[in-house]
UniProtKB/Swiss-Prot annotation:
Protein name, as recorded: DNA-directed RNA polymerase subunit beta''
Function: DNA-dependent RNA polymerase catalyzes the transcription of DNA into RNA using the four ribonucleoside triphosphates as substrates.
NCBIfam families noted in UniProt: rpoC2_cyan
Domain of life: Eukaryota
SUPFAM superfamilies documented for this protein: beta and beta-prime subunits of DNA dependent RNA-polymerase
The organism of origin for this protein: Angiopteris evecta
Length: 1414
């Protein structure tokens, strides 16, 4: 019994924490037995008082906080605002989810904090309040779910569900909330998705790896230990230097405070000593650890420390290994079973907010901050250094300093209210995070478009992966994709043109079902010379009326040109006849059509190409021009290498035939160091010589090596080497081509062309390689008869096609054969389109068409022309494949007076686009909305300049010319935004008066559907005005009524995925200014520039009082309205990945982009258990630690003592493995402590010790002892190195739990864990012996396990320790003791040996033999 003065006295309310502290002090003062008696009395007292109070729990006792409705309403308002910003494209889905999670988490936490004050004010004696807050039953989180709100839950994969449970159990859950709640709790069939088996399997592996660890010694005698440093990790989640981590450990060295020793070596740390150390703020404590214990297959008392159950040193024979495994695995099981986990799962650290003390104007230096985004996607300003900020009001000024790396949420000189959040202070230690990829899926069907900087990844050159290098929007243009099976009756091919007049279609039906077998497929052939065409009604499912085409708009089918389709290569072959000879029949030359995807051909464009095999080469070399003459200016164009990559290449037109040469050589680019190159410069090699490890020369010759930065370029020059003495007509240092028959050296003439190249090595004689040359000859006249090809064409007096030959390389340019190319074409014959009257700008629409005539299917070429006299035509010939969506449904349209128009079918020209879908039996047919071409033509040549001078002189408005293409300029008005001019009269009147002298007329033509003027590419030329020419009136009204002479129809694909037609002027031809919704803007207001093709987001103001209610692209601008094609913007931040090409068609649900963001490593235990398993299985971690700077400083200070040390490499390895062990211990602790689970460090250290106890032998070790790559115990390797003359080289390795369990000294333990057949077969072949030292290998055969405080070997060990301490162990009794103990211990190291020299000499002869036999 303790003294009366030391008795404990408490006079306060006792909660759970106070009860714990009381029990701990009672055990330390009175012991376990007396403490149990006291606690039994306290229990009886508690039951007595509870019985007298009659406390019971009813549903009426669950009181909901009155602030809940207001808090939820405010959170819903913030969620709606976040959803609205996401719809605008201001934030992406990750930022929206992040803000939603933090909003509801803050709401839930605030509601939890308001519970206790609410109970205290309304009902202090509420049973729920008394039981939960006293710790008797239930926790605050559980009560919060009863009377507060359930909060956010996570799914089985650990992802947070973005729909919070707003109700509590008192109010009742809805069906949706109940299903979501089943994920977080254990109810229903959803429980099968919760991975409860993972925690059990984790426990089994942990126990398996440490089941043989038993306390068998009192002191191993080690001088090593681990260092506990209070500054190692300052995060709030884990405190490495705390009182709880010190209790029960043993000091490895004396401990001094202010030069005074307060604790000695091998002293255990009690509660009082731990409290003194924490109060004294000792920074470093050197303690003993299982990681540094010298015992090989066991552990000693002092390295393990206290048994925390009894608060004294662990007893000998204690199976601490199994205790450690269960201590780590069981909390995971309990957490998975939701014993500790309740309610909300969000565990993020919210940054500290800066609030204003009063109303005022905030001021700071704008030069010290820069714009950025918050983690919620909101605009903010980041300050690099400490930022002085002042808030000024009428009466006072408040100055303060914002710490560095903090965010300001307001702008300079902005008015702020009292208690308003104006900034966020960055936490000193950010929690450890990991990079996670979040896929974003498309919400609608349509076409992909982006307006940000997106680059194709070099490592993904053969697929469609792109990387966003600058934050911007990814757009999906709405549309509908129609599928047609290959068996459907659809006779149009890709790029075929459907050309009919507007009044011609009287009846339009959908295509028939392909299952109708009686469908006739006869179609009359339309000859190209018939001016008035008439098609008969057929059974295709739709009918045509009489067609009377306009001569300038009709299509001409060239029936005398034969085309063939190559289905396999997806090519169209054009066959042209050669010139007939007297003895030979007419032969044909094949050309491959090279028509752009839009079908537009301009002056000088290439119609078809032909590649002759005689101008192909399969070897690399250098091109040298001979007698040919080539145009000096090359034509640069896009060449599609395949479906996924596009490159540039240049053509040079051959003006005059002759010859050119290819000088062969082999070229290799080496990215390896020079030590990997096996040949030397200016050496001569034979064919098949090894150049590097993986490169072998195909030919022989002179080797030339050139280094450019870190890249080596190796050239092998074939030919012969000559050392000339006398030259004939050849100047030195000049490379030259020598024709056949010319004498070069004494008695040397070549029968073929050769190339001489002078080479002067350093300090060596000049020599001359004579290199062979390949000659190519090009004739001076074209062998293709072009004139008769278009004889029957109505355009023969307008268009002409000429054959021209082009070469792809300049003089001296290198031809390089890549690994993936078999040959390269040097010369190409092309058919070029030219106009006979160059002054008239024309555009030709060319496309192949297949026509069935008497069951014979033939392919012909159709051509249509549109000409513009002195026009300014906006055009493009991009070969990029465009995909637009079109519907064949009828539409309804409303005019400005809201009059409903009659049902009107689609009746305008279009081009059918068929997109092949590889691997399926379907193909996609895409109809595209028509484009509008606009031409401005005038009878006078200088009308445009006169108009420009007239307006500039009268209204002082400047004009600017912007180059749109090589042959067209467009006129633009530009105003000074700062000083907006007030126009006194309408510009349109001035233009009208001016038009008496120089008329300007607007004409429209519907172009081919799917050309480069399609919707997506308007943004590339956003400064163009295509659909209409607008003029400004004095009231700044958009007045175009005077410039329109006829009723024009517009047909556009709208957001409802149907074709909409709009009349620009109704049938009464009334002036548009009289419409009721006419937009009028005052003179002092600046009209924003709205361009065709411009993308706008929802909520953007187009004019002063006009706001867009949908996100989309402007596809038409009218007198009083703007038409927008429905689009969906997706915000893509820097580093995001786009998974499709520009212009690709996506379906709803397809993966659009992948965002990369950071999240906390451990949240819910569902996420934490896999991380524990990842660490204990020694798997690689993808993310890099954020504390690189701190780790570098630590390593820098640690490694200074190793510099210059002879054993520095050994010490470095030792330090590395020690740091690795501590890293694993701390990481596992972080996962559990983030969930509030306390696990002693010694348990994890025992596991980590077994993971790092193996080493792997290297190749330079002794092969007769261990095989290279064999796993052995570290202690065994050290003993072998001491016994053998030649040491064994080995390196440390970290094994996972499973791998360590399968590499032990007991094959019985291994076979009972995994791979039983393999382990037993391998052990039998190796002749292994199991010494049955552990627990599991004794359980299998039914033997007594060698553990327990009362076991035979433990009693003998205790007897040995006592006799050693008393000095009673004599030499004569050594033999008896050794004989008795040998039956128990199987390793001689366990036996304590006296200092008798004779006995030591005798015993040292046996250990090596025993170890080898093992």
């Amino acid at each position: 019994m303790a003294d009366q003065a030391k008795l404990l006295f408490y006079n306060k309310m006792m909660d759970r924490t106070a009860i714990k502290h009381l029990i701990r002090r009672l055990i330390s003062h009175f012991g376990i037995t007396f403490t149990a008696n006291i606690l039994d009395q306290i229990k009886t007292l508690g039951f007595h008082q509870a019985t007298n109070a009659s406390i019971s729990l009813g549903i009426d006792d669950l009181l909901t906080a009155p602030l809940k409705s207001w808090l939820i309403q405010d959170a819903e308002k913030q969620g709606y605002s976040s959803e609205q910003h996401h719809r605008y494209g201001s934030v992406h889905s990750v930022e929206k989810l992040r803000q939603l999670i933090e909003t509801w988490y803050a709401t839930s936490e605030y509601l939890k904090q308001e519970m206790n004050p609410n109970f205290r004010m309304t009902d202090p004696l509420n049973p729920v309040h008394m039981m939960s807050f006293s710790g008797a039953r239930g926790s605050i989180s559980q009560v919060h779910q009863l009377v507060g709100m359930r909060g956010l839950m996570s799914d089985p994969q650990g992802q947070i569900i973005d729909l919070p449970i707003q109700n509590n159990f008192r109010e009742g859950l809805s069906l949706t909330e109940y299903i979501i709640s089943c994920y977080g709790a254990r109810k229903g069939v959803v429980d099968t998705a919760v991975r409860t088996s993972d925690a059990g399997y984790l426990t089994r592996r942990l126990v398996e790896v440490v089941q043989h660890i038993v306390v068998r010694k009192k002191d191993c005698g080690t001088l090593r230990g681990i260092l506990l440093n209070s500054n190692r990790d300052g995060r709030r989640s884990i405190q490495p230097f705390s009182q709880q981590r010190l209790i029960g450990r043993v000091l490895a060295d004396n401990l001094y405070v202010n030069m005074r020793c307060i604790a000695t070596r091998n002293q255990d740390i009690s509660n009082e000593l731990a409290r003194r150390l924490v109060i004294s703020q000792v920074r470093q404590i050197y303690i003993r650890s299982p990681l540094t214990c010298k015992s090989m297959f066991c552990i000693c008392q002092l390295c393990y420390g206290w048994n925390l159950t009894y608060n004294h040193l662990v007893e000998l024979g204690e199976a601490v290994g199994i205790i450690a495994g269960q201590s780590i695995g069981e909390p995971g099981t309990q957490l998975t079973l939701r014993t500790f986990h309740t309610g909300g799962v969000f565990t993020g650290d919210i940054a500290e907010h800066i609030r204003t003390p009063f109303n005022g104007i905030i001021k700071f230096d704008e030069d010290l901050v820069y714009a950025t985004r918050t983690r919620h996607g909101h605009p903010a300003w980041l300050c690099q250094d400490n930022l002085p900020v002042s808030i000024e009001s009428k009466e006072k000024i408040h100055n303060f300093i914002v710490p560095a790396q903090s965010l300001l949420l307001v702008q300079n000189n902005q008015y702020v209210g009292s208690k308003q959040v104006i900034g966020q202070i960055r936490t000193t230690k950010s929690p450890l995070k990991e990079r996670v990829k979040k896929p974003i899926y498309s919400n609608l069907d349509g076409e992909l478009h982006w307006d940000t900087t997106v680059r194709h990844l070099s490592e993904h050159i053969h697929n469609n992966i792109h990387r966003v290098v600058k934050s911007g929007h990814i757009w999906i243009l709405s549309g509908k994709l129609h599928n047609l099976s290959k068996t459907s009756l659809f006779f149009y091919q890709n790029q075929d043109k459907i050309h009919v007049q507007s009044p011609s279609i009287t009846n339009y039906k959908s295509l028939p079902n392909s299952s109708e077998k009686d469908t006739k497929r006869d179609l009359d052939f339309i000859d190209s010379n018939i001016a008035k065409k008439e098609s008969q009604t057929s059974n295709f499912g739709f009918s045509f009326s009489k067609i009377t085409p306009n001569p300038s708009d009709s299509t001409n089918i060239l029936s005398n040109i034969e085309l063939k389709r190559n289905r396999r290569k997806n090519r169209v072959i054009l066959l042209l006849g050669r010139v007939k000879s007297r003895y030979r029949k007419k032969s044909y030359s094949s050309f491959v059509l090279d028509i752009p995807n839009n079908g537009i051909l301009n002056q000088g464009d290439i119609l078809a190409i032909s590649e002759s095999p005689q101008y192909q080469t399969e070897i690399s070399g250098i091109i040298k021009y001979g007698t040919i003459k080539v145009d000096s200016v090359g034509k640069r164009e896009y060449i599609g290498d395949n479906e996924k990559t596009t490159t540039f290449r240049s053509r040079y037109k051959i003006l005059k035939g002759g010859n050119f040469f290819l000088i062969p050589e082999e070229v290799y680019t080496i990215y390896q160091p020079s030590s990997h190159i096996f040949v030397s410069n200016n050496s001569i090699i034979e064919p098949g010589t090894q150049i590097t490890f993986n490169i072998t020369s195909r030919g022989g010759g002179l080797v030339q090596i050139k280094k450019v930065r870190k890249i080596f370029e190796i050239r092998i020059l074939p030919g012969n080497i000559y050392y000339p003495k006398r030259l004939h007509k050849i100047s030195k240092q000049t490379d030259i081509l020598i024709p056949p028959g010319q004498k070069i050296f004494d008695e040397f003439k070549s029968d073929n062309w050769i190339y001489l190249q002078w080479i002067t090595p350093y300090r060596k004689k000049t020599f001359l390689p004579v290199r062979p040359v390949l000659e190519y000859i090009i004739s001076n006249h074209s062998f293709i008869e072009i004139s008769s090809t278009f004889t029957y064409s109505r355009y023969r007096d307008i268009i002409q096609v000429q054959a021209a030959e082009y070469i792809f390389y300049e003089d001296g340019e290198e031809v390089r054969i890549r690994n993936n190319t078999s040959s390269i074409q040097l010369v190409q014959t092309c058919l070029v389109v030219n106009w006979k009257e160059p002054s008239i700008v024309r555009v030709a629409y060319v496309s192949p068409i297949e026509i069935r005539f008497n069951n014979i299917l033939k392919t012909f070429l159709q051509i249509s022309l549109i000409e513009f006299s002195n026009a300014y035509v906006e055009k493009g010939n991009s070969r990029a494949s465009l995909k637009r969506l079109f519907s064949n449904q009828p539409f309804y349209s409303n005019n400005a007076n809201n009059h409903l128009l009659s049902q009107f079918p689609i009746n305008h020209p279009g081009v059918v686009r068929r997109l092949s879908d590889q691997g399926t039996d379907r193909s996609f047919v895409v109809l595209l909305p028509s484009d509008s071409y606009q031409s401005f033509y005038s009878p006078c040549h200088d009308g445009r300049n006169r108009r420009k001078q007239f307006v500039e002189s009268r209204y002082k408005i400047s004009f600017c010319e912007k180059e749109i293409s090589e042959r067209s300029n467009t006129l633009f008005l530009s105003f000074n935004r700062k000083k907006f001019l007030k126009l006194k009269e309408k510009l349109t009147n001035s233009f009208s008066s001016f038009d008496h002298h120089c008329m300007m007329q607007t004409t429209e033509r519907l172009g081919l559907l799917g050309t480069v003027h399609s919707i997506a590419h308007y943004s590339l030329y956003s400064h163009r005005i295509i659909n209409k020419n607008f003029f400004l009136s004095k009231d700044l009204d958009i007045d175009n009524s005077r410039a329109i002479s006829q009723n024009s129809n517009w047909y556009i694909l709208d957001e409802n995925r149907v074709i909409c037609g709009f009349d620009l002027i109704d049938s009464t031809q009334e002036d548009l200014s009289n419409r009721p919704h006419y937009l009028s803007v005052p003179c002092d207001v600046i009209i924003p520039f709205v361009n065709l093709g411009q993308f706008i987001c929802e909520g953007v103001s187009l004019y002063e009082h006009e706001t867009s209610y949908q996100s989309g692209q402007i596809i038409a601008i009218y007198q009083e309205s703007v038409m927008i094609r429905l689009s969906k913007p997706y915000l893509a931040t820097k580093g995001a990945t786009v998974h499709s090409n520009y212009g690709d068609i996506l379906k709803e649900g397809d993966t659009l982009i992948t965002l990369i963001y950071e999240r906390l490593r451990s949240g819910d235990i569902i996420q934490g258990l896999p991380k524990v398993e990842q660490l204990l299985e020694a798997r690689s971690i993808n993310s890099v630690s954020l504390d690189l700077e701190k780790n570098f400083l630590f390593w820098n200070n640690t490694m200074i003592r190793l510099v210059g040390n002879f054993w520095s490499h050994f010490l470095g390895v030792k330090t590395s493995i020690e740091q690795c062990q501590l890293f694993l211990v701390n990481k596992v602790q972080k996962v559990y402590r983030s969930q509030g689970v306390q696990i002693s460090d010694k348990h994890i250290e025992i596991i980590v010790r077994q993971m790092t106890s193996k080493v792997i032998t290297l190749e330079d070790g002794m092969a007769n002892v261990f095989s290279p790559g064999e796993l052995i115990e570290l202690s065994r390797a050290q003993r072998m190195n001491r016994a053998l003359k030649e040491s064994i080289s080995h390196k440390p390795i970290v094994l996972g739990m499973t791998k360590a369990s399968l590499n032990t000294t007991s094959f019985i333990s291994e076979a009972s864990f995994q791979e039983t057949t393999r382990v037993l077969a391998r052990a039998a072949l190796q002749g292994r012996i199991d010494w049955l030292k552990g627990l599991k290998e004794n359980v299998v055969p039914g033997s007594v396990v060698p553990t327990g405080t009362g076991s035979r070997e433990v009693i003998c060990q205790i007897d040995i320790e006592k006799r050693k301490e008393l000095g009673l162990l004599k030499t004569k009794n050594n033999k008896i003791f050794i004989r008795k103990i040998r039956d128990i211990f199987f390793y001689h190291e366990k036996v304590s040996i006296s200092k008798n020299p004779k006995y030591i000499h005798m015993r040292l002869k046996k250990p090596v033999l025993k170890e080898i036999n093992i």
